[in-house]
Design a protein with these regions (language model features):
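Conserved hydrophobic beta-strand positions in leucine-rich repeat
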Residues: 6-10, 18, 27-31, 50-52, ...
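Consensus "Asn ladder" position of solenoid repeat domains
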Residues: 13, 34, 55, 75, ...
């Protein structure tokens, strides 16, 4: 692999697959606006920023990238593996079809945007550095952000499924 590569921007290229295994020095990866259905960045312990938002392909107008009202999309990324990404600080994965998100090894996160996915359960309790959480338009039934002392911004709107919200002990909110 490209063992010394530190930054890769491959956004808006109509990519259907992306293999970054072996890119162990990678610190920033931008792959938004492609047609990926899975992304594996596991073990990239130097990765600080990952942006892979909006990888949905327009189905009713194949090959088109410009968005029109009424377009029909696939789910975009439905499999995301970020295990071992212990340096990750910024994670932007909005507008995909991600059903679950394991953040247990991403304890350095300060910014998380996972809005407009299919996430039904989200554990952020270990994210003590988190300042911004955008998780709107998901399938969460409960959200507990209590005790996240650095959390300044929380966006959790447009979730009819949400019946429980705990924002206690968040002095920065």
């Amino acid at each position: 692999g490209m063992t010394s590569l530190k930054e890769l921007d491959c956004s808006h290229l109509s990519l259907r697959s992306l293999n970054v295994s072996g890119c162990t020095a990678l610190e920033k990866l931008y792959s938004s606006g492609n047609w990926l259905d899975r992304l594996d960045v596991s073990g990239l312990s130097n990765l600080r920023e990952l942006s892979c938002s909006d990888n949905r392909e327009i189905l009713n107008r194949p090959g088109k990238v410009a968005r029109d009202p009424g377009d029909v999309y696939d789910d975009g990324i439905t499999e995301l593996n970020i295990s071992g990404c212990t340096s990750l600080e910024i994670l932007t994965i909005n507008d995909n079809g991600i059903p679950a998100l394991d953040l247990s090894q991403c304890t350095s996160l300060t910014y998380l945007d996972c809005s407009n996915n299919d996430i039904a359960s989200l554990n952020v309790s270990m994210l003590s550095e988190l300042e911004t959480l955008r998780c709107d338009e998901n399938k969460l039934t409960s959200l507990q952000v209590s005790g996240l002392s650095k959390l300044k911004a929380l966006n959790c709107q447009y979730m009819k499924s949400l019946s429980s919200l705990d924002i206690s002990n968040c002095p920065a909110l």
